[in-house]
């Protein structure tokens, strides 16, 4: 269905530019702010293209009910939710199969980066609320979630940072737009820990060749260097603002 519709809509023009004017390896604008919620242990807000996502972190705290505890390490519970007004057609409130699947893969990705062994019998709750959706929400939410965890002071082996790539009109492109996600031939979200290059999330929707997959991975790995810098700047800016406030 996706490939049939792609034939009807031209997503790459004769100048090899995408519908939004970007080149093949160009990111959409990204802005991250840390420490935006006073009542959460840690929080972050991200705008990535048209995505607007808020993340709140609570914990580590004793896991409840007790039968859910793991004696060896903390349990990371990510809850990804799309607000009813986040998409063009009003979304029915509450979890569905897609949001449950995304919550699971984000929980697993964050568990790989957090030093969960330091907190036996504990849980860390990560609430990801999509206020406005514009393709790539799972990666944007995960990228903001790791900033919120750092804001909460949760010990981590490394931050998690990710991006998407995909196949559009036969070309591999970085950071799919909404139209490219809907009508392109393939979508590949990947998240890594930059220090080691370990992949903590990788999925694929659509068909690509082996060479195209490696091309997508190269594009994403290069993009994560830029996105990782934006994450660090968000955390540094929070403490700069605090220092200015205390100085006054």
From Swiss-Prot:
It holds the Pfam family RNase_PH. Its EC number is 3.1.13.-. CDD domains: RNase_PH_archRRP41. It is found in: Cytoplasm. Keywords: Cytoplasm, Exonuclease, Exosome, Hydrolase, Nuclease. GO terms for biological process: gene expression; rRNA catabolic process. One of its GO terms (molecular function) is 3'-5'-RNA exonuclease activity. Disulfide bonds: none annotated. GO terms for cellular component: cytoplasmic exosome (RNase complex). Component of the archaeal exosome complex. Forms a hexameric ring-like arrangement composed of 3 Rrp41-Rrp42 heterodimers. The hexameric ring associates with a trimer of Rrp4 and/or Csl4 subunits. Catalytic component of the exosome, which is a complex involved in RNA degradation. Has 3'->5' exoribonuclease activity. Can also synthesize heteromeric RNA-tails. Belongs to the RNase PH family. Rrp41 subfamily. NCBIfam families: ECX1. This is Exosome complex component Rrp41.
């Amino acid at each position: 269905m996706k490939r049939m519709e792609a034939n009807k809509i031209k997503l790459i023009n004769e100048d090899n530019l995408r519908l939004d004017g970007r080149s093949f390896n160009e990111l959409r604008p990204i802005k991250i702010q840390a420490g935006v919620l006073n009542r959460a242990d840690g929080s972050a807000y991200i705008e990535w293209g048209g995505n607007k996502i808020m993340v709140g972190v609570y914990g580590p705290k004793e896991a409840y009910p007790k039968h859910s505890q793991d004696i060896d390490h903390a349990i990371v519970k990510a809850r990804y939710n799309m607000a009813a007004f986040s998409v063009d057609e009003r979304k029915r409130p509450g979890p569905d199969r897609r949001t449950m699947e995304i919550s699971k893969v984000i929980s697993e990705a964050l568990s790989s980066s957090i030093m969960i062994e330091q907190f036996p019998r504990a849980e860390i709750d990560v609430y990801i609320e999509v206020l406005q959706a514009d393709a790539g929400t799972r990666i944007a939410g995960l990228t903001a979630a790791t900033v919120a965890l750092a804001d909460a002071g949760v010990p981590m082996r490394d931050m998690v940072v990710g991006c998407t790539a995909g196949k559009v009109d036969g070309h591999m492109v970085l950071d799919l737009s909404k139209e490219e996600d809907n009508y392109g031939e393939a979508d590949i979200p990947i998240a890594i820990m930059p220090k080691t290059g370990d992949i903590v999330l990788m999925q694929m929707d659509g068909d690509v060749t082996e060479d195209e997959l490696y091309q997508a991975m190269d594009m994403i790995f290069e993009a994560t260097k830029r996105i990782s810098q934006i994450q660090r700047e968000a955390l540094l800016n929070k403490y700069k603002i605090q220092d200015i406030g205390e100085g006054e």
